Structure formats: C-alpha cells, structure tokens
Amino acid sequence: MQNQRIRIRLKAFDHRLIDQSTAEIVDTAKRTGAQVHGPIPLPTRKEHFTILISPHVNKDARDQYVIRTHKRLVDIVKPTEKTVDALMRLELAAGVDVQISLG
C-alpha cells in the first residue's frame, strides 16, 4: 500500500454537505498517518432551466431554475492499512456521491 495513491471524487448539490464530508475524509486520513493533498475544489456545473408558467399564452411569464453540482477532489498519498480500514467504515452524508479510484 505504500506506493499507491487513493483518489476520492465527491459530488453534491449542497456545498455544505460536500465540505463537511471532505473534512471528515481528510481528518480520518491524517489521523491514520497518511499524507493528504486537497481538498481541491473542481469547477461547479450549473444547469439552467427555463419553464413557461402560463398554460396557453403569456410567453413572457417564465420561471428560471438553476441546479449546481459541486465537486471536490482529495488525494491520499502513501495510505496505510489503517487508512483504508478507517475510510471503509466512514459514514458520509446521504446527499454526497463518492467515487474512489486506486492509482
């Protein structure tokens, strides 16, 4: 495990949830003796939707909505056995999507 790297990508619609989850991951990794690079904020994806609120006429009556997808990246360099075990047992918020890759 000494020469490997764990890359964790987090996605969420709520920036507070993703920041809280990232802090938990960084604290857990540092507590177990691994080096941590990050959290690195990645570009936020914004999706814009415009919806007509009038059923028939009044083309000017519209609502606009935005969905923001926040992303963070955390690299764990030189993870130990304790680091992997602690990350597997870690409970994160339900609104956060986590992708883990070994490299």
Swiss-Prot record:
An example of a GO molecular function for this protein is: tRNA binding
Q: Which GO biological process annotations does it have?
A: translation
Q: List the keywords (alphabetical).
A: Ribonucleoprotein, Ribosomal protein
- Domain of life where this protein originates: Bacteria
Any one GO CC term of the record: ribosome
Check the record and name the SMART domains matching this protein.
Ribosomal_S10
- Describe the function of this protein: Involved in the binding of tRNA to the ribosomes.
Task: Tell me how this protein assembles.
Answer: Part of the 30S ribosomal subunit.
**What protein family does this chain belong to?**
Belongs to the universal ribosomal protein uS10 family.
What's the protein called, per UniProt?
Small ribosomal subunit protein uS10
User: What organism is recorded for this protein?
Assistant: Baumannia cicadellinicola subsp. Homalodisca coagulata
- Encoding gene per record: rpsJ
